[in-house]
């Protein structure tokens, strides 16, 4: 038997990769973790000459061991194709002494495309492999980015439905339009009267609702998740960190075995966890800088060892990071306990029941590769403007948080290790905030969202992405809204089982 998966809370063991992807969340509410982190078995200098698709196979085959070579290569080929506007898929851009890993060249101009382009193919392949004949209902909470990418990935995929919940006042105008204009007879999106944590908690409750599960199965449905709690989201994200290192090696920017640092703007902790998995696989990564916005629960955690979600929720200009419950941190907690499911489960119950937990000194020592930092909205805007004024390179507000935190980290630590910054969205996904950062409030006056887009393009010389042009005149197809307590009824209504 190849690599298997178990729950971080101990309720499920020896689950195959395909079943873990199909389930999304373990039955006990935990997240699936591989029984071990496999080591890269291709030399880095050989990876340096590989395409993104070839690199993806070499990384993913180590985690998805019950997929055949043909199955996995077929999923990869269907995912990383002309949907991306560059053959490199994830190019690197050097600016102001750092390497920006541009993860926004997919169909929805955000990093979630990197995993959500392949997840539908991994999932439908898994259903065939496991003889599942029920319709798979993808249930997803989004802070703005995952929703559109998931809907685009699953649109009209046979045997699937997708239902996305997002906070009504917690996403950008472009993000909302991208979701509400999404085509596909199997797609639904619902605005909730609450924040992202409310949406995520509501989705998790539905996953754990045994009565709802039985009712769905009786009607021929089965839940799964497209959120980064699904291991099928996490594994594809490891690929681009390996690819980035290999391309730096190929370009002569680093030497074989030379350490790099990685800076990631962080909300739900999935993207930076993928970088950590790459490090555990043998990629020469020294420090992982976890960049937070004003919702700095992760900064406080890495600084004090205490995770406390009982605090004010702040709406910022980097809305996809406006999160107080970072779900994927549970996987790192599990690893830091020595994979003790009882210990990690106890801490997660503390978070659920009391809103906080504290890790031991030994667990903190295990996490010493991580450094936390945060940037205020003002620091974020100033960083975007300075980088643009100095170099002409334009970044979005989430990448701005990362760049700001990196600047402070480098100043305070004196660490001049070559650094990759995860650039997680096109500046046009957050054109209002980016324009305000580089041109001030007067740059926005009298302009609607698309006039701001055009002004930003004229000012920066950066072309407007096709994904934004497509929604300029697209018809709104989705108008559902509900309260936080009505999410289950909304799902049942959409599926016709109410």
Predicted feature descriptions by range:
Residues 1-498:
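PLP-dependent amino-acid enzyme catalytic core
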């Amino acid at each position: 038997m190849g690599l298997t998966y178990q729950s971080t809370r101990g309720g499920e063991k020896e689950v195959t990769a395909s079943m873990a992807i199909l389930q999304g969340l373990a039955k006990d509410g935990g997240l699936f973790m591989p029984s071990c982190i496999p080591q890269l078995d291709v030399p880095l200098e050989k990876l340096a000459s590989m395409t993104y698709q070839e690199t993806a196979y070499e990384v993913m085959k180590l985690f998805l061991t019950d997929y055949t070579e043909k199955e996995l290569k077929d999923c990869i080929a269907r995912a990383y194709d002309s949907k991306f506007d560059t053959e490199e898929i994830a190019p690197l851009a050097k600016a102001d002494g750092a390497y920006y890993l541009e993860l926004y060249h997919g169909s929805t101009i955000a990093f979630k495309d990197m995993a959500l382009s392949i997840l539908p193919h991994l999932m439908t392949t898994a259903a065939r492999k496991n003889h599942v004949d029920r319709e798979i209902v993808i249930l997803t909470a989004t802070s703005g980015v995952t929703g559109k990418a998931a809907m685009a990935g699953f649109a009209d995929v046979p045997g699937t439905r997708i239902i996305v919940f997002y906070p009504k006042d917690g996403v950008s105008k472009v993000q909302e339009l991208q979701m509400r204009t999404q085509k596909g007879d199997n797609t639904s999106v619902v605005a909730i009267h609450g924040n992202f944590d409310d949406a995520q908690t509501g989705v998790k409750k539905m996953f754990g609702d045994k009565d709802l599960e039985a009712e769905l199965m009786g009607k021929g449905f089965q839940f799964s998740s497209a959120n980064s709690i699904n291991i099928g989201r996490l594994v594809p994200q490891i690929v681009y960190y390996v690819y980035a290192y290999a391309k730096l090696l190929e370009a002569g920017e680093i030497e074989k075995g030379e350490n790099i640092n990685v800076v990631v703007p962080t909300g739900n902790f999935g993207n930076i966890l993928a970088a950590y998995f790459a490090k555990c696989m043998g990629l020469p990564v020294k420090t992982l800088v976890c960049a937070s916005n004003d919702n700095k629960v992760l900064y406080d955690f890495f600084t004090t060892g205490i995770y406390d979600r009982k605090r004010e929720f702040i709406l910022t200009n980097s809305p996809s990071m406006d999160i107080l419950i970072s779900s994927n941190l549970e996987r790192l907690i599990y690893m830091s306990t020595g994979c003790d499911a009882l210990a990690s489960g106890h801490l997660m119950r503390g978070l659920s029941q009391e809103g906080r937990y504290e890790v031991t000194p030994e667990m903190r020592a295990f996490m010493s590769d991580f450094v936390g930092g945060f940037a205020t909205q003002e620091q974020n805007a100033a960083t975007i403007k300075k980088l643009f004024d100095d170099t002409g390179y334009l970044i979005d507000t989430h990448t701005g948080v990362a760049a700001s935190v990196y600047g402070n980290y480098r100043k305070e630590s004196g660490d001049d290790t070559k650094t990759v910054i995860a650039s997680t969205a096109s500046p046009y996904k957050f054109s209002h905030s980016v324009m305000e950062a580089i041109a001030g409030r007067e740059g926005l006056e009298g302009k609607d969202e698309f006039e701001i887009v055009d002004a930003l393009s004229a000012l920066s010389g950066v072309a407007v992405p096709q994904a934004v042009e497509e929604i300029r005149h697209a018809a709104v197809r989705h108008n559902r809204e509900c309260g936080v307590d009505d999410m289950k009824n909304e799902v049942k209504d959409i599926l016709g089982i109410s």
